[in-house]
Each structure stands twice: as structure tokens, then as C-alpha cells.
Regions:
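Beta-alpha junction/loop-to-helix N-cap segments that form part of ligand/metal-binding clefts
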Residues: 167, 186, 192-292
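Long amphipathic alpha-helical scaffold segments
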Residues: 68-171, 177-186, 196-237
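Periplasmic-binding protein-like
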Residues: 259-268, 285-287, 328-332, 380-407, ...
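Bacterial signal peptide processing site
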Residues: 11-14
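C-terminal motif of bacterial Sec signal peptides marking the signal peptidase cleavage site
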Residues: 6-9
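Extracytoplasmic ligand/sensor domains, especially the bilobed periplasmic-binding protein
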Residues: 262-265, 269-343, 347-357
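Extracellular/periplasmic periplasmic-binding protein-like sensory domains
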Residues: 414-488
């Protein structure tokens, strides 16, 4: 039965024209897929013919590439004695078999393989592989980056994304020159009278005065527990490509023709998706991350971003380390808030926690209306639904709250929480870096007493000389500080690119976090925690 259906497909494939009565349809593609599924991956010439017949009917780029990738996988799994009986009019099938021969003869020599593929394309210009090579074959043509990669930096250098692209570029190029050394911690230089006096009132007065004197300065954190590693050296010139309004295939072709063997970028998610779908024949460190269902293992594609989901996972880990049992996630009422809550819950349960709860809040105006009516935020919520099985519903009162809010929102949310609870039931409060905007005055710091928040090492006291250097480059804009830190770490990752795919133990203390590599070569950032304490910002205890 399989043979008969496959040969029927072969007749459609071998026709050079399609009449009105033979117009292919979605049902034809589904019919061929049912034959493929029935074969259960068992290699055969008949199933190869079905793949070939199905290919021109697939209009979705992802499905089309999947067809080619599956055909190639099956072809590489076949024994030589299975590849026989090719008819004279089966030019497509003959082309694939010829390409297999080129691959097997040159798979250990990427340059020779590329040359062989180029020659093959001229001989089989109508083969679907001439336009869309199998992903595994493309990856076989890519050489390692090496210790001194030639880097093409893909960033928006004009248009609305220009300010973000420039901040990343500045950090990237400054890292190439080397980072300034970290100064000796100033944590031990306070007057002796304020240390160990045992007089809490005098200590607080001293700290408040010191904070007020420096109110207009950028609050620095002196931390000996957070560090930023030295960056690799590479004297190769870096070329910046403006991605604004440009098509990724043309930019990639230009970069590779000019001899660049590593692309860092692009930044915009739509561009990252385009470069992933085009199966680019070059190593790529994308500066954004695709959704989980779009990620696929590629030996030449890694993802690095300032992911707020990573911060949520950090918060879940921190609460578990501190022995918290019943967390509430307080997020904006938006798809963004839903994503953050889900990321927190998944990590919380992965670390052995029960079901986490979620509550949303509205705009700043609605928060002000609520606080004017004396309406607080009660410690209740709805369970966050994640795919984890067998997780028990946690019982008891809320003992920790993770707040994802802007600074203006946090100044309303914190007192609203305190309005609705008694002092004996006060939960620990944790916030994301979203609320830390810098230049906070003494009143704000005292108002936020006890709140812990995550922040990138560059802003958490790891290297205040580097922070001062960045301050002059980004006009003291905290959001741009973080992008500058991302640029520094992109440089470190780019110059360690070969280790990212092959070393699950890879770690680097970066300016944007402690970096490690997770599945599908996604870079994960672990952030340090700070805390508002007696009018100052200090490393969290």
C-alpha cells in the first residue's frame, strides 16, 4: 500500500506542468504527510519520493524547511544498497542523491563541502535544495569561529531603535579596548564613630545625612561579592551594519562575502526570526530570543538578551534559597505580565515549590484612585497555570511578593500592600530591575525600606570605575546602562563562541549578569540582589 501511494506521488512530482484539474491542494499535502507518518521514519526510496511530491505544496516556510530537513535526514540514514531504481525522469531525486555523495566525500572539510555544494547548485538549479539547503548540511559547511573572530555587528543604527543600538555598540566596542579595573571597595571607609557604636539612632542619622549630601549624585553600591571578569582580546576590526529597513538575507550575504565569520545581532525580534528561518550559513549570536516553540538546536545560532523572564526565574530561586513557601507574583494586567508570571511559576516549581499565585494591577492612575479610597492590595491571587504535572497546591499565608513594576508604580504598590496587612504578617518584598531607575533621593530610599531588587552587576557595585565610564556614554539613563552592559557581554560571548555550543559548564561573570548556556544555546543571566536598608542601597543579605 505504501509503495502504491508513494508512486502516485512520484507521478505528480515528475510532471513538468500542472493543469487546472491537477491543481495541488492542502489536502494533497496532508495526504502525503499521512504516508510519511505511517512510515514512522523508516528509510526507503518510496518515502523519499513522497517527500519530493509534498515539497512544492508547502507554502509555509517552516513546514517547507521541515520537509527538506526530514528528507535529508532520511537520505543520510539510508544504506548504499537501498539507493537504487531511480527513473530517468526523476531529476529531483537524482539531485538529492548526488548531493549526498558530495556530502559524504567532503563532510570533514567545510571549505571543500561549500565548493562542492556551489558546483551542485549550478548542475541542479531547479532542485528545492538549491534554494533551501537542509539545515544539517548548512551547519556542516560552517567553520569554527576561532580565537579571533571577524565580527559583523548587526544593530539598528537609525530609526526608532537607534538609541538602543548605539548603547549596545558602545559597550561592545569599549569592551574590545579592555575594561577599567575595579576600585578598592569603599565599604570600610565610613567614620569609625558610625561603626559598631551600637547606637541605632545615631547610625541612622549619619546614614541619612550622608545620603542627603549625595542626593544629586549617582548612588553607588560598594560590593565585594559581585565581580565582572576581564574580557577577551581581539584586534580584528569590527564592522557595524545598520539593520534599519534592511532585509536579513542581503545583509548576511554582504557580511559573509566580506569575510566576516560571526554575526552579533540582530536586535529586533522580527530580524532574529528572519535570520533563524533563512538558515544562515554563518555563526550568529542573536541579541534577542525567540519564543520557546520557535527554538531549535543549531550549531551556528545562539541567543543572548536582557530577558525579564530570566529576572523572574532569579526571583523564584532567591525566594527558595531564603526558605519562602508561599509566593505571590504581582504584575501588570497585560500579556507581558502573564509571561513574567508564567516564567516565575515554572522556575518555582522546578525548584520544588508548589503552586504560585498571581495578582495583576492596572495603570498608575487606577492605583492612585485605589489608594485615595484607602483600598490596599490584599495578599490573595489566582494559581498560575503551567504545564508541570503533580504539583500540589501550597497552603498558608503569603510570605513573599515578587513585584514587577516601574518606580512610579512601586511607590504606590508598596504602601497599598502595607495598608492591607498587619505588621506581624508582613511578607518579604522583591522587585525586578524595572523599578530601579537611578537618581533615587533619600526619601524614596527610606520609603522602600526592606525591598530587595535584582540588578545587573554593572549597577550593583561590581566595578564602579566601569560604571563611571558607562555613565559618560549613556547620559545616566538606567535602561541604556543595561544595554551598555549587554554590549560588553556580547563581546565576551562572541570571543568565546566556540565554547558556547560545546561546553555546558561555560560560565562568565558578565556586566549584565552571571552568564551560562542553557538548551538551544540560550544564554541565561543570573543577577545579584540589592536591598534598600536605612536609606541606602546595599547588597542583599
Amino acid at each position: 500500500m505504501l509503495s502504491t501511494l508513494a508512486l502516485t506521488g512520484c507521478q505528480i512530482e515528475s510532471s513538468t506542468t500542472t493543469t487546472a484539474t491537477q491543481q495541488p491542494s492542502v489536502s494533497d499535502a496532508s495526504h502525503y504527510q499521512s504516508i510519511i507518518d505511517a512510515a514512522q521514519g523508516k528509510p526507503s526510496m518510496d518515502v523519499l519520493r513522497v517527500y519530493i511530491s509534498q515539497e512544492p505544496l508547502l507554502t509555509d516556510p517552516a513546514q517547507h524547511q521541515a520537509n527538506i530537513d526530514s528528507l535529508w535526514l532520511m537520505l543520510t540514514q539510508m544504506k548504499p544498497e537501498q539507493i537504487q531504481g531511480i527513473e530517468a525522469d526523476e531529476n529531483i531525486l537524482l539531485g538529492w542523491v548526488d548531493l549526498l555523495d558530495i556530502y559524504q566525500n567532503n563532510k570533514d572539510d567545510p571549505e571543500a563541502l561549500r565548493t562542492g555544494i556551489d558546483d551542485w547548485k549550478t548542475r541542479y538549479p531547479h532542485n528545492p535544495g538549491a534554494k533551501n539547503l537542509p539545515t544539517a548540511l548548512v551547519q556542516g559547511t560552517i567553520t569554527k569561529v576561532g580565537a579571533n573572530p571577524r565580527i559583523a555587528l548587526f544593530l539598528p543604527m537609525s530609526g526608532q531603535g537607534q538609541v538602543f543600538g548605539q548603547a549596545i555598540m558602545q559597550g561592545f566596542l569599549d569592551a574590545q579596548k579592555g575594561l577599567p579595573s575595579s576600585p578598592v571597595s569603599q565599604a570600610s571607609t565610613a567614620p569609625a564613630a558610625s561603626q559598631g557604636s551600637g547606637n541605632d539612632v545615631l547610625d541612622q542619622i549619619y546614614q541619612e545625612v550622608a545620603a542627603t549630601v549625595n542626593e544629586n549624585a549617582n548612588t553607588e553600591v560598594a560590593s565585594s561579592t559581585v565581580s565582572i571578569d576581564a574580557v577577551p582580546t581581539n584586534t580584528q576590526s569590527v564592522k557595524v551594519f545598520d539593520t534599519q529597513g534592511k532585509a536579513m538575507p542581503q545583509l548576511v550575504a554582504q557580511a559573509t562575502s566580506e569575510g566576516y565569520n560571526l554575526i552579533v545581532g540582530p536586535l529586533l525580534k522580527s530580524d532574529v526570526q528572519a535570520i533563524a528561518q533563512m538558515n544562515a550559513p554563518v555563526n550568529v549570536l542573536a541579541l534577542n530570543e525567540l519564543d520557546a516553540n520557535q527554538l531549535q538546536p543549531r550549531t551556528n545560532l545562539c541567543y543572548f538578551s536582557l530577558s525579564p523572564e530570566d529576572e523572574a526565574k532569579n526571583a523564584a530561586n532567591q525566594m527558595r534559597l531564603e526558605g519562602k513557601q508561599m509566593p505571590l507574583v504581582l504584575v501588570p494586567a497585560s500579556p507581558f505580565g502573564d509571561r513574567i508570571a508564567k516564567a516565575f511559576a515554572e522556575e518555582w516549581q522546578a525548584k520544588g515549590g508548589g503552586t504560585a499565585l498571581m495578582q495583576t494591577f492596572g495603570s498608575t492612575a487606577s492605583l492612585k484612585e485605589s489608594i485615595n479610597r484607602g483600598q490596599g492590595i490584599r495578599m490573595t491571587g489566582t494559581p498560575i497555570n503551567v504545564a508541570t504535572q503533580g504539583v500540589e497546591q501550597a497552603n498558608g499565608s503569603i510570605d513573599a511578593v515578587y513585584i514587577v513594576a516601574t518606580r512610579d508604580e512601586l511607590t504606590l504598590v508598596k504602601p497599598m500592600i502595607e495598608m492591607a496587612i498587619s505588621s506581624r504578617q508582613r511578607p518579604a518584598l522583591y522587585a525586578s530591575s524595572r523599578s530601579n531607575q537611578g537618581n533615587s533621593n533619600a526619601d524614596y530610599r527610606f520609603e522602600m525600606e526592606g525591598v530587595k531588587f535584582s540588578e545587573v552587576p554593572l549597577l550593583a557595585g561590581a566595578n564602579n570605575n566601569l560604571r563611571k565610564q558607562a555613565q559618560g556614554k549613556v547620559n545616566n539613563d538606567y535602561s541604556l546602562f543595561r544595554l551598555y552592559a549587554m554590549g560588553i557581554d556580547a563581546w565576551s560571548l562572541a570571543n568565546n563562541y566556540d565554547n558556547l555550543q560545546n561546553n555546558g559548564q561555560f560560565r562568565v561573570n558578565g556586566a549584565s549578569g552571571m552568564l551560562s548556556v542553557h538548551e538551544n544555546c540560550v544564554i541565561y543571566r543570573e543577577l545579584p540582589w540589592l536591598q534598600f536598608k536605612q536609606g541606602q542601597v546595599k547588597p542583599a543579605q
